Protein backbone atom coordinates (compact mmCIF):
# COMPACT_ATOMS: atom_id res chain seq x y z
CA UNK A 1 0.00 0.00 0.00
CA UNK A 2 1.17 3.51 -0.81
CA UNK A 3 2.04 5.74 2.10
CA UNK A 4 4.55 8.16 0.52
CA UNK A 5 3.14 11.58 1.33
CA UNK A 6 4.73 13.09 -1.78
CA UNK A 7 1.96 11.37 -3.72
CA UNK A 8 -0.76 13.42 -2.04
CA UNK A 9 -0.62 16.01 -4.84
CA UNK A 10 -2.22 13.21 -6.87
CA UNK A 11 -4.64 12.07 -4.20
CA UNK A 12 -4.20 8.48 -3.20
CA UNK A 13 -7.94 7.89 -3.04
CA UNK A 14 -8.88 9.97 -6.11
CA UNK A 15 -11.01 13.10 -6.35
CA UNK A 16 -14.58 11.86 -5.93
CA UNK A 17 -15.31 9.39 -3.16
CA UNK A 18 -18.93 8.40 -2.76
CA UNK A 19 -20.10 7.93 0.81
CA UNK A 20 -22.33 5.04 -0.19
CA UNK A 21 -25.67 4.27 1.38
CA UNK A 22 -26.20 0.80 2.80
CA UNK A 23 -29.11 -0.86 0.98
CA UNK A 24 -31.63 -2.74 3.07
CA UNK A 25 -34.25 -5.29 2.10
CA UNK A 26 -37.91 -4.85 2.94
CA UNK A 27 -37.23 -6.81 6.14
CA UNK A 28 -34.40 -4.46 7.12
CA UNK A 29 -31.53 -6.81 6.37
CA UNK A 30 -28.46 -5.59 4.51
CA UNK A 31 -28.97 -6.15 0.78
CA UNK A 32 -25.47 -7.20 -0.21
CA UNK A 33 -26.41 -7.99 -3.82
CA UNK A 34 -27.82 -4.51 -4.35
CA UNK A 35 -24.77 -2.99 -2.64
CA UNK A 36 -22.59 -4.71 -5.23
CA UNK A 37 -24.71 -3.37 -8.10
CA UNK A 38 -24.81 0.14 -6.66
CA UNK A 39 -21.07 0.35 -5.99
CA UNK A 40 -20.25 -0.75 -9.53
CA UNK A 41 -22.72 1.76 -10.93
CA UNK A 42 -21.09 4.53 -8.90
CA UNK A 43 -17.62 3.57 -10.12
CA UNK A 44 -18.85 3.65 -13.71
CA UNK A 45 -20.45 7.06 -13.18
CA UNK A 46 -17.79 9.32 -11.77
CA UNK A 47 -16.66 7.85 -8.46
CA UNK A 48 -12.95 7.18 -8.00
CA UNK A 49 -13.61 5.38 -4.75
CA UNK A 50 -16.32 4.14 -2.44
CA UNK A 51 -16.58 4.89 1.27
CA UNK A 52 -18.49 2.20 3.13
CA UNK A 53 -19.93 2.29 6.63
CA UNK A 54 -19.67 6.01 7.20
CA UNK A 55 -22.42 8.40 8.26
CA UNK A 56 -24.27 7.97 4.97
CA UNK A 57 -23.83 4.21 5.26
CA UNK A 58 -25.61 4.18 8.64
CA UNK A 59 -22.67 2.73 10.54
CA UNK A 60 -24.27 3.41 13.96
CA UNK A 61 -26.99 0.85 13.20
CA UNK A 62 -24.82 -1.76 11.46
CA UNK A 63 -23.19 -4.52 13.45
CA UNK A 64 -19.44 -5.01 13.03
CA UNK A 65 -20.22 -8.35 11.34
CA UNK A 66 -22.55 -6.65 8.84
CA UNK A 67 -19.95 -3.98 8.13
CA UNK A 68 -17.29 -6.60 7.46
CA UNK A 69 -19.54 -8.65 5.18
CA UNK A 70 -20.55 -5.52 3.28
CA UNK A 71 -16.92 -4.61 2.69
CA UNK A 72 -16.01 -8.11 1.51
CA UNK A 73 -18.95 -8.15 -0.92
CA UNK A 74 -18.27 -4.72 -2.41
CA UNK A 75 -14.48 -4.91 -2.51
CA UNK A 76 -14.58 -8.31 -4.16
CA UNK A 77 -16.85 -7.08 -6.94
CA UNK A 78 -15.11 -3.87 -7.96
CA UNK A 79 -12.28 -3.22 -10.36
CA UNK A 80 -8.98 -2.97 -8.50
CA UNK A 81 -8.59 0.66 -9.58
CA UNK A 82 -11.63 1.65 -7.51
CA UNK A 83 -10.51 2.47 -3.99
CA UNK A 84 -12.65 1.10 -1.18
CA UNK A 85 -12.36 2.94 2.13
CA UNK A 86 -14.17 1.53 5.13
CA UNK A 87 -15.36 3.41 8.19
CA UNK A 88 -13.66 1.99 11.26
CA UNK A 89 -14.17 4.83 13.72
CA UNK A 90 -15.62 4.51 17.19
CA UNK A 91 -15.74 6.52 20.40
CA UNK A 92 -14.05 3.53 22.02
CA UNK A 93 -10.37 3.47 21.07
CA UNK A 94 -9.96 -0.29 21.42
CA UNK A 95 -12.95 -0.89 19.13
CA UNK A 96 -11.57 1.49 16.51
CA UNK A 97 -8.17 -0.19 16.70
CA UNK A 98 -9.64 -3.66 16.21
CA UNK A 99 -11.90 -2.54 13.36
CA UNK A 100 -8.99 -0.84 11.59
CA UNK A 101 -6.79 -3.92 11.99
CA UNK A 102 -9.56 -6.00 10.44
CA UNK A 103 -9.88 -3.55 7.55
CA UNK A 104 -6.14 -3.88 6.91
CA UNK A 105 -6.22 -7.67 7.10
CA UNK A 106 -9.21 -7.77 4.73
CA UNK A 107 -7.54 -5.71 2.02
CA UNK A 108 -9.14 -2.29 2.40
CA UNK A 109 -7.53 0.56 0.49
CA UNK A 110 -8.00 2.89 3.43
CA UNK A 111 -9.93 3.54 6.62
CA UNK A 112 -12.12 6.49 7.53
CA UNK A 113 -11.71 7.21 11.23
CA UNK A 114 -14.17 9.64 12.74
CA UNK A 115 -13.47 11.89 15.71
CA UNK A 116 -14.84 10.14 18.83
CA UNK A 117 -18.43 11.19 19.43
CA UNK A 118 -20.40 11.84 22.63
CA UNK A 119 -17.52 11.50 25.11
CA UNK A 120 -15.89 14.75 23.79
CA UNK A 121 -12.19 14.09 24.47
CA UNK A 122 -9.74 17.00 24.70
CA UNK A 123 -7.11 17.43 22.00
CA UNK A 124 -4.57 15.29 23.86
CA UNK A 125 -7.15 12.53 24.07
CA UNK A 126 -7.83 12.83 20.35
CA UNK A 127 -4.11 12.62 19.65
CA UNK A 128 -3.75 9.45 21.72
CA UNK A 129 -6.88 7.94 20.13
CA UNK A 130 -5.71 8.44 16.55
CA UNK A 131 -2.12 7.55 17.45
CA UNK A 132 -3.27 4.17 18.73
CA UNK A 133 -5.18 3.55 15.51
CA UNK A 134 -2.28 4.65 13.30
CA UNK A 135 0.22 2.44 15.13
CA UNK A 136 -2.02 -0.60 14.81
CA UNK A 137 -2.93 -0.02 11.16
CA UNK A 138 0.56 -0.80 9.80
CA UNK A 139 0.68 0.89 6.38
CA UNK A 140 -3.07 1.20 5.85
CA UNK A 141 -3.78 4.79 4.73
CA UNK A 142 -6.05 6.62 7.17
CA UNK A 143 -8.48 9.45 6.49
CA UNK A 144 -9.33 11.45 9.59
CA UNK A 145 -12.96 12.56 9.73
CA UNK A 146 -13.79 15.83 11.44
CA UNK A 147 -17.53 16.46 11.74
CA UNK A 148 -18.09 18.44 14.96
CA UNK A 149 -21.80 18.93 14.26
CA UNK A 150 -22.31 15.21 14.86
CA UNK A 151 -19.50 14.40 17.27
CA UNK A 152 -19.62 17.45 19.53
CA UNK A 153 -15.84 17.63 19.29
CA UNK A 154 -13.56 19.53 16.89
CA UNK A 155 -10.22 18.13 15.75
CA UNK A 156 -7.89 21.13 15.59
CA UNK A 157 -5.29 21.65 12.84
CA UNK A 158 -2.43 21.66 15.38
CA UNK A 159 -3.47 18.17 16.47
CA UNK A 160 -3.69 17.02 12.86
CA UNK A 161 -0.16 18.34 12.29
CA UNK A 162 1.14 16.28 15.21
CA UNK A 163 -0.64 13.21 13.86
CA UNK A 164 1.08 13.59 10.51
CA UNK A 165 4.21 12.19 12.15
CA UNK A 166 2.54 8.86 11.39
CA UNK A 167 3.25 8.00 7.76
CA UNK A 168 -0.17 6.46 7.19
CA UNK A 169 -2.16 9.56 8.18
CA UNK A 170 -2.54 11.00 4.72
CA UNK A 171 -5.84 12.81 4.48
CA UNK A 172 -8.80 14.33 6.26
CA UNK A 173 -12.49 14.68 5.50
CA UNK A 174 -13.31 18.24 6.53
CA UNK A 175 -16.99 18.39 7.41
CA UNK A 176 -17.18 21.26 9.86
CA UNK A 177 -19.08 23.38 7.34
CA UNK A 178 -16.32 25.99 7.50
CA UNK A 179 -14.30 26.85 4.39
CA UNK A 180 -11.71 28.30 6.76
CA UNK A 181 -11.02 24.78 8.00
CA UNK A 182 -9.25 23.98 4.73
CA UNK A 183 -7.24 27.20 4.86
CA UNK A 184 -6.19 26.50 8.45
CA UNK A 185 -5.23 22.91 7.68
CA UNK A 186 -3.21 23.96 4.64
CA UNK A 187 -1.45 26.70 6.59
CA UNK A 188 -0.43 24.40 9.44
CA UNK A 189 -0.13 21.00 7.76
CA UNK A 190 1.01 22.00 4.27
CA UNK A 191 0.20 20.34 0.96
CA UNK A 192 1.28 16.90 2.18
CA UNK A 193 -2.16 16.46 3.76
CA UNK A 194 -4.95 15.77 1.27
CA UNK A 195 -8.05 17.65 2.40
CA UNK A 196 -11.41 16.41 1.15
CA UNK A 197 -14.56 18.46 1.42
CA UNK A 198 -17.17 16.67 3.48
CA UNK A 199 -19.94 18.84 2.03
CA UNK A 200 -21.00 18.78 -1.63
CA UNK A 201 -22.19 22.37 -1.45
CA UNK A 202 -18.73 23.52 -0.31
CA UNK A 203 -16.70 21.50 -2.81
CA UNK A 204 -15.97 24.31 -5.26
CA UNK A 205 -15.19 26.92 -2.57
CA UNK A 206 -12.94 24.41 -0.80
CA UNK A 207 -11.14 23.54 -4.04
CA UNK A 208 -10.31 27.23 -4.37
CA UNK A 209 -8.43 27.16 -1.05
CA UNK A 210 -6.63 23.85 -1.51
CA UNK A 211 -8.97 20.88 -1.11
CA UNK A 212 -8.25 17.99 -3.47
CA UNK A 213 -11.70 16.41 -3.77
CA UNK A 214 -14.89 15.44 -1.99
CA UNK A 215 -16.42 12.67 0.05
CA UNK A 216 -19.79 13.04 -1.58
CA UNK A 217 -23.42 12.15 -1.06
CA UNK A 218 -24.66 13.79 -4.27
CA UNK A 219 -22.33 11.65 -6.40
CA UNK A 220 -24.86 8.85 -6.06
CA UNK A 221 -26.85 10.92 -8.56
CA UNK A 222 -24.51 13.40 -10.28
CA UNK A 223 -21.04 11.88 -10.10
CA UNK A 224 -20.11 12.75 -13.67
CA UNK A 225 -21.20 16.36 -13.20
CA UNK A 226 -19.10 16.64 -10.05
CA UNK A 227 -16.12 15.19 -11.89
CA UNK A 228 -16.58 17.74 -14.67
CA UNK A 229 -16.76 20.53 -12.09
CA UNK A 230 -13.51 19.46 -10.46
CA UNK A 231 -11.59 19.07 -13.69
CA UNK A 232 -13.01 22.30 -15.10
CA UNK A 233 -11.71 24.12 -12.04
CA UNK A 234 -8.32 22.42 -12.24
CA UNK A 235 -7.93 23.25 -15.93
CA UNK A 236 -8.75 26.91 -15.42
CA UNK A 237 -12.31 26.76 -16.76
CA UNK A 238 -13.63 28.39 -13.62
CA UNK A 239 -16.79 29.79 -15.21
CA UNK A 240 -17.86 26.29 -16.27
CA UNK A 241 -17.10 24.92 -12.81
CA UNK A 242 -19.15 27.72 -11.27
CA UNK A 243 -22.07 27.05 -13.62
CA UNK A 244 -22.16 23.39 -12.56
CA UNK A 245 -21.85 24.37 -8.90
CA UNK A 246 -24.80 26.75 -9.20
CA UNK A 247 -26.93 24.25 -11.12
CA UNK A 248 -26.41 21.55 -8.49
CA UNK A 249 -26.98 23.75 -5.43
CA UNK A 250 -30.72 22.93 -5.16
CA UNK A 251 -29.86 19.23 -5.11
CA UNK A 252 -27.11 19.71 -2.54
CA UNK A 253 -29.55 21.58 -0.31
CA UNK A 254 -32.33 19.03 -0.80
CA UNK A 255 -30.11 16.13 0.19
CA UNK A 256 -29.79 17.73 3.61
CA UNK A 257 -33.40 18.91 4.04
CA UNK A 258 -33.41 16.51 6.98
CA UNK A 259 -30.90 14.16 8.54
CA UNK A 260 -28.54 12.39 6.13
CA UNK A 261 -28.99 9.70 4.74
CA UNK A 262 -32.79 9.98 4.79
CA UNK A 263 -33.04 12.23 1.68
CA UNK A 264 -30.44 10.40 -0.43
CA UNK A 265 -32.17 7.08 0.20
CA UNK A 266 -35.44 8.62 -0.96
CA UNK A 267 -33.70 10.18 -3.97
CA UNK A 268 -32.26 6.83 -4.96
CA UNK A 269 -35.68 5.24 -4.64
CA UNK A 270 -37.11 7.95 -6.91
CA UNK A 271 -34.28 7.20 -9.35
CA UNK A 272 -35.05 3.49 -9.52
CA UNK A 273 -32.80 2.14 -6.78
CA UNK A 274 -34.80 0.29 -4.12
CA UNK A 275 -32.28 0.78 -1.32
CA UNK A 276 -34.91 0.56 1.41
CA UNK A 277 -35.67 2.82 4.33
CA UNK A 278 -33.10 3.88 6.91
CA UNK A 279 -32.88 1.79 10.04
CA UNK A 280 -34.46 3.07 13.23
CA UNK A 281 -34.08 5.52 14.91
CA UNK A 282 -33.93 7.26 11.53
CA UNK A 283 -37.23 7.41 9.67
CA UNK A 284 -38.30 7.61 6.01
CA UNK A 285 -38.62 10.94 4.24
CA UNK A 286 -42.04 12.55 4.65
CA UNK A 287 -44.35 12.65 1.63
CA UNK A 288 -44.16 16.45 1.44
CA UNK A 289 -40.37 16.37 1.42
CA UNK A 290 -40.39 13.56 -1.13
CA UNK A 291 -42.48 15.72 -3.46
CA UNK A 292 -39.96 18.56 -3.12
CA UNK A 293 -37.11 16.17 -3.80
CA UNK A 294 -38.84 14.67 -6.83
CA UNK A 295 -39.30 18.14 -8.34
CA UNK A 296 -35.60 18.90 -7.93
CA UNK A 297 -34.51 15.57 -9.40
CA UNK A 298 -36.64 16.18 -12.49
CA UNK A 299 -34.90 19.52 -13.02
CA UNK A 300 -31.42 17.99 -13.24
Swiss-Prot record:
Q: Which GO terms describe its molecular function?
A: 4-hydroxy-tetrahydrodipicolinate synthase activity
Q: Which top EC class is given?
A: lyase
Which residues hold pyruvate?
56, 215
Please provide one cellular component term from the Gene Ontology annotations of this protein: cytosol
Q: Where in the cell is it found?
A: Cytoplasm
The EC number(s) given in the record are 4.3.3.7
Catalysed reactions listed for this entry: L-aspartate 4-semialdehyde + pyruvate = (2S,4S)-4-hydroxy-2,3,4,5-tetrahydrodipicolinate + H2O + H(+)
List the CDD domains hit by this protein, alphabetically. Answer: DHDPS
Identify the catalytic residues: 145, 173
Keyword terms, alphabetized = Amino-acid biosynthesis, Cytoplasm, Diaminopimelate biosynthesis, Lyase, Lysine biosynthesis, Schiff base
Gene Ontology terms: biological process: diaminopimelate biosynthetic process; lysine biosynthetic process via diaminopimelate
User: At which residues is there a site annotated Part of a proton relay during catalysis?
Assistant: 55, 118
What is the purpose of this protein? Answer: Catalyzes the condensation of (S)-aspartate-beta-semialdehyde [(S)-ASA] and pyruvate to 4-hydroxy-tetrahydrodipicolinate (HTPA).
Q: How is the subunit organization of this protein annotated in UniProt?
A: Homotetramer; dimer of dimers.
As for family, the record states: Belongs to the DapA family.
Q: Specify the protein name.
A: 4-hydroxy-tetrahydrodipicolinate synthase
